[in-house]
A protein has these predicted regions:
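FAD-binding core of flavoproteins
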Residues: 76-176, 180, 299, 303-307
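Alpha-helical interface subdomain recognition
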Residues: 1-75, 161-307
Length: 307
């Protein structure tokens, strides 16, 4: 097992990062926030130029790694478009993208988009989105569903995993922004980065981020290798680790930015706000933990260190 992306996948991610920056970078989100119905027009041409929608992550290992890399790059720039969900689309449904939902309260960050969307629950129950309901912050919207079948177990793991790569990209950016901030900002005649307490806080955040980085690579391998049930468990474990890490990383980054970190003039504010749908849907920390625990029972996760 090689727990790293291929050189080609990493290069694809780097090119995507540059393309998103050239297309407007942080301003893409600002513009989409003001006019959600422009999300596709702002982003899809860039994705088309990169050939993102030509990837086949469900059937090709190289495409799977490239898809993860581009999702991470999309997260870095908080790209106002559901790249991961588009790439997770199932082969056997007439849908442009796939979202994992909580059947009790299906929702997703799809405001302003007119694509054909499908949803799947952890039990493999698939539906199509009949219409978008009430909207909330950060493009979140309730979904009105039309049932299709219960044959979607093989679709779940990838649809859980790729959004975690998007969230990982957001954590990358939050750490980079905060490192730059404390290296520039001075207090008592010296930069904030020179204070030991600040160094400890940043180290705590980086440990969380790097842990998600490693687990995301393992889960990507699991999605492409293991049976559906094991892959779903690994994907849920990744999701739990990612949203727990996000709480630590964004808390530390906001603390070190101070009050300015909550102002729209700073990128961290936008990044933090638009990470919320990824962290809350389909489940937040508590329910993700409960679901994973109930699925595993006394068996534990299957992995490198299982007995």
């Amino acid at each position: 097992m090689i727990l790293d992306l291929s050189d080609d996948a990493k290069e694809f991610g780097r090119q995507a990062l540059k393309a998103f920056e050239a297309a407007g970078g942080d301003q893409l989100l600002v513009q989409a926030d003001a006019k959600p119905d422009t999300r596709a027009a702002l982003v899809v041409p860039v994705l088309d130029s990169l050939g993102v929608f030509e990837l086949e992550p469900r059937s090709d290992a190289d495409s799977l790694e490239a898809a993860a890399a581009v999702c991470r790059s999309a997260g870095y720039w908080a790209l106002p478009y559901p790249v991961a969900e588009r790439l997770a689309s199932p082969h056997d449904l007439d849908a442009d993208g796939l979202v994992v939902v909580d059947p009790a309260a299906p929702e997703a960050a799809l405001q302003g988009l007119d694509n054909r969307w499908a949803t799947v629950t952890l039990d493999g129950v698939r539906s199509t989105v009949a219409r978008l309901g009430a909207t909330g912050p950060s493009f979140a919207t309730a979904l009105e569903l039309s049932a299709v079948d219960d044959a979607g177990c093989d679709d779940v793991a990838l649809a859980l995993t790729l959004p975690c790569w998007t969230l990982l990209g957001m954590l990358d950016r939050a750490i980079d922004l905060t490192t730059a901030h404390v290296s520039l900002r001075k207090q008592f005649g010296q930069t904030l980065s020179s204070f030991q307490g600040v160094q400890f806080q940043l180290t705590d955040a980086e440990v969380e981020r790097s842990g998600v980085d490693m687990l995301a690579k393992y889960t990507l391998w699991s999605v492409g290798t293991n049976p559906a049930d094991e892959a779903i468990n690994d994907a849920l474990a990744l999701r739990l680790a990612a949203i727990e890490a996000a709480e630590v990383v964004f808390r530390v980054c906001h603390q070190l930015h101070g009050a300015v970190g909550f102002c729209d003039e700073t990128v961290l504010s936008w990044l933090s706000r638009y990470s919320q749908p990824l962290r809350r849907s389909p489940f937040g920390v508590s329910k993700t933990r409960d679901v994973l625990t109930s699925r595993l029972g006394r068996r534990g996760l299957t992995g490198l260190f299982s007995s």
